[in-house]
């Protein structure tokens, strides 16, 4: 059974300050404070002062006839491997360039209970850093009904439980000053994406600014050779402030081979361009490990020709053994029948001889 979490977003790429109860069992509306930069965004974008403490509110309503418990989680903005910004809960770690963590700055209750027909405010506290900064701090407020049964579906023989949550974006800034994003290459290494062999290009947006309309082009070659083994181009990607991306380049279902390689990487966004050439190696240990885990290769290994050959040889050996046993038995049977015939013939000859002797005596 697989549990999938779907986010119904109100973040810097989507706006919705009111919503139907739908599958979540509750509704919310945003109460914008005076320092909201724009009140038609559907998410919080606040201009703050260093060290300022402020409370923001989200109005929660339960239109149903049963009590609803809403789990509240606060998450810093991250970038997933598809170049999509995640404001909901994720396993992606913080980038080392992150100076101020959203979850240290924004705090609030872990859950809210609503009786049938009740409306209540979810109050969150923002404590801005004492040190001033340029750029933005970004994150999300995740609202999810506790003990959610979700909707189920069957795909590929597996039961999938779909659960739903609202995610409301929060962007904090101290000025209107626009800073440019900047990228730093961290590593290129072998790994797996969705249990299939891949090469991962890991790089960071080290500035407190969004990077939009990003295009990534990667080509992988064997060191000292020009033939492109694997390549990928992806457009219309984004990066969160002070976040990294693990960009996978598929090995197209091929076995991973140990050796020395070169990654040629080009990232563009508008008139900005970053270009890197990075040598990397794949060890025998890693190649064997990932090949054993690659689901495509495991399925191919279902036709294990060595095993099939052993089975065929075993069957042939069994057939030969049975044939030899039958031949031996038939030979023994024939020898026995031949011996009986000889014995009968001998007795018949002896009987004839005895008859002739009797006639002579008479």
What spans do the regions from the language model cover?
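Intrinsically disordered, low-complexity Pro/Gly/Ser/Thr-rich segments with frequent PxxP/GP/PP motifs
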Residues: 92-132, 221-256
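Cytoplasmic C-terminal tails of single-pass
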Residues: 331-362
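Terminal connector regions
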Residues: 66-93, 127-176, 255-294
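Sec-dependent N-terminal signal peptides of Gram-positive bacterial secreted proteins and lipoproteins
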Residues: 1-15, 309-327
């Amino acid at each position: 059974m697989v549990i999938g979490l779907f986010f119904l977003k109100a973040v810097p790429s989507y706006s919705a300050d009111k919503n139907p109860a739908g599958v979540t069992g509750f509704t919310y509306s945003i109460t914008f404070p005076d320092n909201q930069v724009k009140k038609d965004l559907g998410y919080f974008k606040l201009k703050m002062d260093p060290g300022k403490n402020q409370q923001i509110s989200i109005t929660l309503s339960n239109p149903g006839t049963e009590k609803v418990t809403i789990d509240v989680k606060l998450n810093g903005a991250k970038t997933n491997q598809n170049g999509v910004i995640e404001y909901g809960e994720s396993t992606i770690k913080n980038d080392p360039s992150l100076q101020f963590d959203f979850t240290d700055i924004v705090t609030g209750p872990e859950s809210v209970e609503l009786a049938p027909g009740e409306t209540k405010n979810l109050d969150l506290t923002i404590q801005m850093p004492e040190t001033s900064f340029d750029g933005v701090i970004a994150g999300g407020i995740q609202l999810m009904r506790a003990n959610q049964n979700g909707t189920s579906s069957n795909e590929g023989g597996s039961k999938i439980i779909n659960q739903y949550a609202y995610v409301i974006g929060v962007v904090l800034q101290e000025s209107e000053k626009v800073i440019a994003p900047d990228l730093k290459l961290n590593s290129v290494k072998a790994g797996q994406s969705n249990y299939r062999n891949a090469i991962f290009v890991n790089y960071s947006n080290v500035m407190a600014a969004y990077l939009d309309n990003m295009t990534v082009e990667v080509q992988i070659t064997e060191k000292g050779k020009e033939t492109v083994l694997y390549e990928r181009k992806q457009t219309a990607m984004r990066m969160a402030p002070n976040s990294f991306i693990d960009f996978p380049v598929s090995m197209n279902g091929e076995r991973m081979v140990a050796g020395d390689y070169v990654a040629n990487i080009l990232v563009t966004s508008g008139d900005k361009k970053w270009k890197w050439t990075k040598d990397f190696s794949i060890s025998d240990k890693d190649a064997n490990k990932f090949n054993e885990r690659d689901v495509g290769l495991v399925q191919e290994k279902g036709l294990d020709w060595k095993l099939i050959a052993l089975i065929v040889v075993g069957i042939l050996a069994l057939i030969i053994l049975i044939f030899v046993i039958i031949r031996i038995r038939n030979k023994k049977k024939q020898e026995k029948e031949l011996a009986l015939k000889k014995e009968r013939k001998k007795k018949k000859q002896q009987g004839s001889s005895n008859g002739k002797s009797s006639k002579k005596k008479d």
